[in-house]
């Protein structure tokens, strides 16, 4: 085994970080120690994970994640269509002036209201029940599903819930996994908004990850989703 790879695997950060990456977590620059470790050993860990048929990716925004190949040896799950729609809304909010005005803090209610405002409400109600009438009860159930989705995306490292108020959160740069493919000169926020309103498919390269062992209250948001495979 190459010396530097041996050093990487012997590092005390590796066991927990490896588990997080395999569970689909994105490691951003705010995670100082883990991010610095990945920067130091990126080349060696790319070779290590290649043996499992997954790629260690460093995104242009600086965060790291594992991207599965079709022959990956690491178990995969899927994100539901609602998960991905909420992810697109989070990316839109990340690009919004409100993020700076609010010191980067949003509430779960603001997320829900933005979702209802920007996405097709009839389609959203189908996530609750195919025969949904849009009743107050259906809207309440949708709001509960959005909260569950937010918790799933938290585990993926895309949002951080504030420790003193679990109704408030900040958004990380990892939500750019849900971002539109923006051509030079275009307004990223406008392109993202068009993608949300048009209901375009997610341009995710290889899929996102989720550890099924942590699927508390998420059984209805799992493999019957969009079919985008996850490690």
Curated annotation (Swiss-Prot):
The keyword Cell cycle applies. The keyword Transcription does not apply. It holds the Pfam family MukE. One of its GO terms (cellular component) is nucleoid. InterPro entries: MukE_C, MukE_N, Scp_MukE. Residues 197-231 are annotated as: Disordered. This is Chromosome partition protein MukE. It comes from Photorhabdus laumondii subsp. laumondii (strain DSM 15139 / CIP 105565 / TT01). The gene is mukE.
């Amino acid at each position: 085994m190459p010396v530097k790879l041996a050093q990487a695997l012997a590092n005390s950060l590796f066991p927990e970080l490896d588990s997080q990456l395999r569970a689909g977590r994105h490691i951003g620059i705010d995670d100082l120690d883990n991010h610095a470790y990945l920067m130091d050993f990126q080349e060696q860990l790319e070779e290590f994970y290649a043996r499992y048929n997954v790629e260690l990716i460093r995104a242009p925004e600086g965060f790291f994640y594992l991207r599965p190949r079709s022959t990956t040896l690491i178990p995969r799950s899927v994100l539901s269509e609602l998960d991905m729609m909420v992810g697109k809304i989070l990316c839109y909010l990340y690009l919004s002036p409100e993020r700076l005005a609010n010191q980067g803090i949003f509430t779960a209610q603001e997320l829900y209201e933005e979702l209802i405002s920007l996405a097709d409400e009839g389609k959203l109600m189908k996530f609750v029940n195919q025969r949904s009438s849009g009743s107050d009860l259906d809207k309440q159930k949708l709001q509960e599903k959005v909260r569950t989705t937010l918790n799933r995306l938290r585990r993926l490292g895309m949002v951080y819930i504030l420790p003193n108020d679990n109704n408030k959160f900040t958004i990380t740069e990892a939500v750019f996994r849900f971002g539109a493919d923006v051509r030079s000169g275009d307004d990223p926020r406008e392109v993202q908004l068009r993608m949300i309103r048009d209901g375009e498919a997610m341009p995710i390269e290889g899929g996102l990850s989720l550890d099924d062992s942590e699927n508390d209250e998420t059984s209805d948001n799992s493999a019957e989703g969009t079919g985008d495979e996850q490690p």
